[in-house]
């Protein structure tokens, strides 16, 4: 009988403020669920919890997916908040950092998207541009698109020989919904994709002992119209 890997999606919270319902909801974006299902994996949400539970959560899944969401707190990398910093969620930051550390200890593959890339970099000692429009001198690409999310709006260049290039080739168009980005890349990682203005759009692990692919765009919003972006989910499940 065929078995399917269990993938933990690090979840987020939202507040339902309707008259009938005033609950805090734990959720994961449906694009991640669909991408994993199409790749023949079983998605489960890992709700934001006590960081002490991270070891147990990671022990029960075969891989960790880090999703998008709030800005990462700059206090985690020794900076004060910039005037253009958006909403942060320290409890989510703390929990996901422990999930990342446990995934490393247990050698579980990681796929990180947008904020997921950013918290992964910070968790291992990297830093971020808190707001690229005001802090990154060479910006010349719009990284917060107004076009519908299923449509790519700028291109990236990908390092040949990288895991990412096996899936996407050496150049591809992507969508873009971020105002933060990698500034100093953590020593454990190697950059493998860049926008035309030099922003790091993806990185991978230097070590063969830890499988990591992290991307700055949102492939989960492109998979219905792009088989090539579904390939990122297929690749993740293959790495499990």
Language model regions located:
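N-terminal beta1-alpha1 cap of cysteine-dependent amidohydrolase-like domains
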Residues: 1-111, 122, 129, 133-165, ...
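Active-site-proximal beta-strand elements of phosphoester/diester hydrolases
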Residues: 213-216
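Hydrophobic, aromatic-enriched interface-forming segments
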Residues: 117-120
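Conserved G/P- and acidic residue-centered "switch" motifs that form tight phosphate/ATP-binding loops
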Residues: 114
